[in-house]
Amino acid sequence: MAASAAALRRSLAGAQQGRPFGPPVAGSSEFPALARRSTVSIAQGEERRKNVYTALQAIDRELREKMKGKRYVVIKPNFVNVFNQLASSHADAMRGILDYLSESFQGPVVIAESSAGDTRRGFDNFRFQALTREYARQQVKLIDLNDEAKFETVALLDADLHIVPCRIAARLVDPEAFVISSAVLKTHNTVIASLSIKNMVLGAPLHAPNSVRPSWSDKRKYHVGLRQTHYNMMVTAQRLDWGASLIDGFEGMEGNGPSSGTPVASRIAIASADYVAADRVAAETMGMDPEWLGYVKYCGQLGLGQFDPARIDVIGAKIADVQKKYRMHPDIDRELQWRGPMTELTPNLGWTHALGDERRG
């Protein structure tokens, strides 16, 4: 018994100094690798609408398979700022998606968003209303998820690492809907980059309709600490598990994203039936290390999608040919602190102290 305890103390001490715990148990892995391959398409050109259509058409077979049995499609745009077009989804990106769906899906289409601001104002400012007329045959409707006020609940961690309930839009987890995350290629002020996962998981939480007082917003429950944010995003992605991702990088955003950065003329669109693979490839097109994106890596480790580049097939344009070095947010050093040791709480807790951990907080 004493020998076993001493061995465990040595193993723990090695881990604390950056050395591995030791050889893995034969046949086991902390996070089993996802064996299946995933495909990500990249389209590049001088027309946003055409890029989006081309990127989706390139993975048509995969998308049609996932759309089987679905009653309707939900397109989830990004309206992080209902006044700044650069920060938000463009109507021409919607047209590219709707052009593709007109050929591949027989059923109504809903464009649904839960902006942190006034979603209806975003529909007006970015001229989404015209889409309902142009695509009347597809019965396109615009829905403010905050006004719809139907929700399910997911458990998150708060700033004190206690669990709290969060209301997420029921329509985004409707088993009868094929959900497309229509994101924008942007840097971010907390989680390094805002891509298809970020678009979904921070668009899903609801806030009070504008007519309701006192107001409330469950989106705030994600902004409770760097580590908690990445974890909470993973938990929410696991619950949502949508069908396809489309990332519009015709004009990306660098610097002070996701709302106030400056434009980058990447002139691309990225599409995949695997949102983890889509976000990994998107990060590479921005010239950043995908390992920086904790929430994307966590989703990959959980098996929600493919994070291993050796198992991702990129079709269309090559990453190296479209890659641009995006300028990161000014707070990038702070944002990356999630990767290091946790110093917010003393590590000298419970059984580690009993086994000889003499660290002091």
Where are these regions (language model features)?
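N-terminal and secondary-structure boundary signal
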Residues: M1-G361
